[in-house]
Amino acid sequence: MKIKHYPGKAVDASLSLEGSSAMGALYEANWLRAANQPAAPATTGTKLSRQSSSAGSSFLIEGISALSKYQMTLENIRQLELQSRDKRIASTIKELSGYRPSALQHHQQQQMHNVWVAEDQDQEHEELEDASEGKEKLASIQEPPAVNHYVLDPTERPRVPRPRQQFSVKPPSLRRSQTMSQPPSYATLRSPPKIKENLSKSSSAYSTFSSAAEDSQDQVVICQQPQRLMAPPPREPPPEPPKRVSKPLSRSQTSVQRYATVRMPNQTTSFSRSVVRSRDSTASQRRLSLEQAIEGLKLEGEKAVRQKSPQISPAASSNGSSKDLNGEGFCIPRPRLIVPVHTYARRRRTGNLKEQSSGGQEEEAEKGKGWKDFYVLSQDRHSSFYINRIGQNYDYDYPINFNIFSPDGRVEVSREGKYLSTLSGAKVLGELAILYNCQRTATITAITECNLWAIERQCFQTIMMRTGLIRQAEYSDFLKSVPIFKDLAEDTLIKISDVLEETHYQRGDYIVRQGARGDTFFIISKGKVRVTIKQQDTQEEKFIRMLGKGDFFGEKALQGDDLRTANIICESADGVSCLVIDRETFNQLISNLDEIKHRYDDEGAMERRKINEEFRDINLTDLRVIATLGVGGFGRVELVQTNGDSSRSFALKQMKKSQIVETRQQQHIMSEKEIMGEANCQFIVKLFKTFKDKKYLYMLMESCLGGELWTILRDKGNFDDSTTRFYTACVVEAFDYLHSRNIIYRDLKPENLLLNERGYVKLVDFGFAKKLQTGRKTWTFCGTPEYVAPEVILNRGHDISADYWSLGVLMFELLTGTPPFTGSDPMRTYNIILKGIDAIEFPRNITRNASNLIKKLCRDNPAERLGYQRGGISEIQKHKWFDGFYWWGLQNCTLEPPIKPAVKSVVDTTNFDDYPPDPEGPPPDDVTGWDKDF
């Protein structure tokens, strides 16, 4: 989608229009006319008579656009010009919140403007009577004559000539965010007279505006420099002059279309001149269609000067929308706010970074979030960036492209009114927009004419998701055709497909040479290869056969036989592409994982039934609140006890239903309840029972009064090797339990690790946990920026391997006190993550074995991460860094923890911060019924 933005200062939330905007001048003129000259409002359309019958009749209905009070469409603006004495305009504009045209501040200095001025009637009649003489005169000033003539409607008010004013070539002083450049789509003259060489005269500017779609005849279209109009004093209408009939010029007087650009000091003013050589009598045959115009743009897009000027077809004009000379839709000038403001603090924000408003619905092909009927500046979010028309919301990433009229397209970056930098050329703006929804960090203002190529977030993510799924399915089908792979499980095939690397060979290249040693296996994905064998007696290569797409070779190398028995030569003229996997990677992935996956199948079933039986009769009214343990995104966590039992306490998590619905987190809440309700692991916080009412959802959970691991890390600065090893081992055990059930956690960080009274760590907050189908991936962008894996950022799909990445990040943070990937804002953090763990300098206090484990966990390729390979998570437990660690004692909770928190009683909350009561009060009721199964 190609979006055209026009230069000018960024518009604030009150929609005060700048003087460099032609539409701003129109608003101002209409506002002043309506306020000073009351008249009866028109309720019917005004018919514009034309000479040509092929053009048809055009009706413009007066009124204000109902789609938004902040802008009027071009057709309505033109109607207001025809019905200039409409009292309702003033009252309508006054209703706009905070709207006051900036020209009401009567500036003493009038901005420079270029308008075509009508000559004396006698001169024009003289010119039209003598066509050949007119042609010579026009040629002398290098300006083509008009072809779009018509008979004036007697019901129309004639234009009142105004005193001509000279303008200086020197433009007024410009601020950094202003420009004097203007694209050729703001104004068109309906009845242009003879054109003088002197362009420094003014007339009743903007009172003769007309759209290309309304003028069905060929026309001279002129690009004017927008100006700030000063309101003329009220005057009596003069008597109507006699009707004037313009004579059409002959074909011999027309010239070929061309563009010209006039450069002035400190500004760029483009004038578009076009005259079509007519070869047919009908207007439809003389005009280029919109499709031809677009095709012409594609062919001529790289040229500095275009050779043809496309016109708009009648079909296009029938839609009621105006088109400019470039074949693009006429757009009312819009704000150019592009980039977001991200609230960033050490208390890291975790969330569904893909779409805060949607709650990250985990469907693999999420639909758009709809649109809201308000102007973009009232919300200033990426998810509601105004692009095409009022009422549509898009999520865009903006690379700047060069403009044919302005090769030096530039934008200005500012924050809170302070200038930061100027960008030009092939720069990218709004990178975060295609990842997730967040507030803008800066203001981007077009200071020259720019062409922007935009991509919508949902479109980008859908393309990435579908491309990944198609590639995965294609690679899996290739593997199933190989005898040594056909009996492997589906998830194993998917793992192998993830590590296949595509390599390319040119015609004549030897992919494999007979007698050479190799450990790689090949699958042909494109092209053909020739198989030959060198005969020992003649040393000549004997042709064996041809192999094509889907065929494979080198399979014996995976089984240990590394001596090549034939030559494989690229035969296709376009080259050959092969999918390659080496023996080491293959052996790491291929194993019998059934024992690991089913280790916990029958464990804890009896204990879960016992818990359900014990808490079956407990009601919400049986609980009394002792203190507040924490405050979350949807509510609070309270320390509670049951009536009549002071020997134990629980954590009651209460979540506001209305806020859950507002942020569309229903699916995540239901998933959290399901996963925690089925879990029975001593390294995961237990869920005992759930409640609900009209306002809240409640989760009665195990209380961990030792506090957050983050609090201890903050106080100590960092942990030593032994302490880090213990807490990492607790997380490994929790991941072992979850991953054996194909559950991905996706929110690991010290803030989500709670210590119980003994000092053992437990995972809490399963809001982003998800149960995956075997061998499948998910595409939701969620988590904490410092812990997000590269495949999540790149939208390639992720699975449990993303948890192993975050485990390596956690190890680094526990050993040093800070995560390895940290930037001043999320985008900088993501860029550091994409550079990889090898670009990170490890402090000296990290031992060699710890560094080795972190780097193996944080591999860029998910399939190469330790824990995701052949031995599963046991490969982590067997790593040298864990040598001598008492895993059996940890699993049975007999191992002494390195830090034992001070907990005096079951209601001791000294390890938690103090929290005030909820200042917002009770939320509104929610009776939609989405939580019936909670």
From Swiss-Prot:
GO terms for molecular function: ATP binding; cGMP binding; cGMP-dependent protein kinase activity; protein serine kinase activity. Coiled coil: none annotated. 3',5'-cyclic GMP 2 binds at residues 545, 554-557, 564-565. Residues 200-213 have a biased composition (Low complexity). It catalyses: L-seryl-[protein] + ATP = O-phospho-L-seryl-[protein] + ADP + H(+); L-threonyl-[protein] + ATP = O-phospho-L-threonyl-[protein] + ADP + H(+). It is an enzyme of class 2 (transferase). Residues 883-934 form the AGC-kinase C-terminal domain. Residues 623-882 form the Protein kinase domain. It comes from Drosophila melanogaster. It comes from the Eukaryota. The lineage of its organism: Eukaryota, Metazoa, Ecdysozoa, Arthropoda, Hexapoda. The active site is at 747 (proton acceptor). InterPro entries: AGC-kinase_C (IPR000961), cGMP_dep_kinase (IPR002374), cNMP-bd_CS (IPR018488), cNMP-bd_dom (IPR000595), cNMP-bd_dom_sf (IPR018490), Kinase-like_dom_sf (IPR011009), Prot_kinase_dom (IPR000719), Protein_kinase_ATP_BS (IPR017441). Residues 175-185, 218-227, 249-258, 308-324 have a biased composition (Polar residues). Residues 121-287, 301-327, 910-934 are annotated as: Disordered. Its EC number is 2.7.11.12. This is cGMP-dependent protein kinase, isozyme 2 forms cD5/T2. ATP binds at residues 629-637, 653. GO terms for biological process: feeding behavior; habituation; larval feeding behavior; larval locomotory behavior; long-term memory; motor neuron axon guidance; protein phosphorylation; receptor guanylyl cyclase signaling pathway. Pfam families: cNMP_binding, Pkinase. Residues 121-131 have a biased composition (Acidic residues). PANTHER family: CYCLIC NUCLEOTIDE-DEPENDENT PROTEIN KINASE (PTHR24353), PTHR24353:SF111. 3',5'-cyclic GMP 1 binds at residues 430-433, 440-441. GO terms for cellular component: cytoplasm; cytosol; plasma membrane. Keywords: ATP-binding, cGMP, cGMP-binding, Kinase, Nucleotide-binding, Serine/threonine-protein kinase, Transferase. Belongs to the protein kinase superfamily. AGC Ser/Thr protein kinase family. cGMP subfamily. The gene is for.
